[in-house]
Amino acid sequence: VVLASSLTESQAHFFGEEYAGLEEVGAIFGAKGDFNREAVAASGAQIVIDVGDTKKGMAEDLDALQEQLGIPCVHISSNLATYGDCYRALGELLGVEERANEIADYCDAAYKEISDVMETIPVEERVDVLYLSGEDGLSCVANSSYQANVVDMVSDNIAVVDDPSGKSNQTNMEQIISWDPEFIIFAPLSAYDLAGTDAAWQTLTAIEGGNYCEVPSEPYNWLNGPPSVNQVLGMQWLPRVLYPEKFDDDMYETVAAYYKTLYQYDLSEDEFNEITARAVPVVDQK
């Protein structure tokens, strides 16, 4: 087994040290595109599996890679609605159907729960949201982009731009003020701290009212970093922030169930509180 990217120390804490030393061979697709064919060939890998958004030309690229490496190269399409199918396919490919079905059933149940809740909230009553990233907070995760799957599903993502990019779109404070969202989500290492003190940010309805938070990021960003199965956790977290009246369960129990099912990790309440310290709207922290 080799990895597209190596694990950080904090990620290895959740996955286990046996995964920390696996070789990094880079990503086939995406912004990096740093796939190391020689390292894969030397590793003795028996199959290459790419999971994610299906893009034009991907099949041809994988066919060429398969010819070069002499081993099967497979792409499995995935999104919020199909993570269950994705894991079932992985289970069949790798001969671990029982474990894959456990995760698949969890993903399907989570998607159904949130879909059912969102059906009770008319589109016009959904919270106007901006999801901002970048050190200065001036990049937005645009409506209808692959990275915005969760935000689009559970809110009115008002970051409508002419040409949504794969990850984020550059914007400016004037545009953000014009959008004036009801709620702002900041990516990790973005402008969460700045927003609490900067005069320009304070002119926004969401910031003035304390209706903003930061996405948890352990072991991965819960919304889109990367846009993978961690989105299932974000899909359960974000609507509980935006529409708490629609849920009567305990957020810790919900998050702990995800960690147990996906990572086989027993998340303590202290760890949960640390991970989600900024995931609660500022107005509710006071």
Each language-model region and where it sits:
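Short acidic active-site motifs
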Residues: 35-36, 61, 171-175
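A short, structured surface patch at a secondary-structure boundary
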Residues: 1-43, 47-56, 157-159
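Alpha-helical, coiled-coil/dimerization segments enriched in small aliphatic residues
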Residues: 29, 140-167
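A contiguous binding-surface segment within folded domains or other stable secondary-structure elements
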Residues: 43, 161-214
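Extracytoplasmic substrate-binding proteins
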Residues: 60-139, 161, 168, 216-279, ...
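Structural recognition of the beta-strand scaffold that forms the well-ordered cores
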Residues: 1-5, 47-51, 72-77, 127-133, ...
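Short, structured coil segments at secondary-structure junctions
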Residues: 43, 68-69, 154-155, 207-208
